[in-house]
A protein has these predicted regions:
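C-terminal output helix
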Residues: 108-117
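His-Asp phosphorelay/catalytic-motif detector in bacterial-type signaling
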Residues: 45-47, 74-79
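Short, glycine/charged-rich "phosphate-handling" switch motifs in NTP-dependent
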Residues: 101
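Charged docking surfaces used in two-component/phosphorelay signaling
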Residues: 15-23
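Short hydrophobic/Thr-rich beta-strand motif most characteristic of the beta2 strand and flanking loop
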Residues: 25-34, 40, 104
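Active-site beta3 strand of CheY-like receiver
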Residues: 44-55
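Short amphipathic alpha-helix used as the core "switch/output" element in two-component signaling
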Residues: 39, 61-76
Length: 124
């Protein structure tokens, strides 16, 4: 069973993603705290991380968390898809530089999300 970690400060966004991915039979683990992501990845061992760029009132941001994951031997091989409401070329470039496998713009539809995950994980 595929496991996806959803890290987003929006309860609503996490719920939408959970419903979408659960409909595929995938296991979903969640956090609204960016600082908790590295430990979640080490313990839950997800196949993929969906990581928001901006966490209101929190430091680090999603870019920092992605860099942390990619810099740690235990978590570097877990693919990350960054999620953002901002369509700025600089953000897309920073996500790639941080090691993200993809950058998905909010709002996105269920099919777009599922296809992005399947593409990154090379699933049919």
């Amino acid at each position: 069973m595929l496991t996806v970690l959803v890290a987003d400060d929006s309860n609503h966004m996490r719920e939408l993603v959970r419903i979408t991915l659960s409909s595929q039979g995938w296991r979903v683990v969640e956090t609204g705290d960016p600082g908790a992501v590295p430990d979640f990845v080490k313990t839950a061992k997800p196949d993929l991380v969906l990581l928001d760029v901006t966490f209101e009132g929190f430091k680090p941001d999603g870019f920092d968390v992605c860099r942390t994951l990619k810099g740690d031997e235990q978590t570097r091989d877990v693919p990350v898809i960054m999620l953002s409401a901002h369509d700025r070329a600089a953000d897309v470039a920073e996500a790639r530089a941080a090691g993200a496998a993809n950058y998905l713009l909010k709002p996105f539809g269920p099919i777009e999300l599922i296809n992005a995950i399947k593409q990154v994980l090379d699933l049919k």
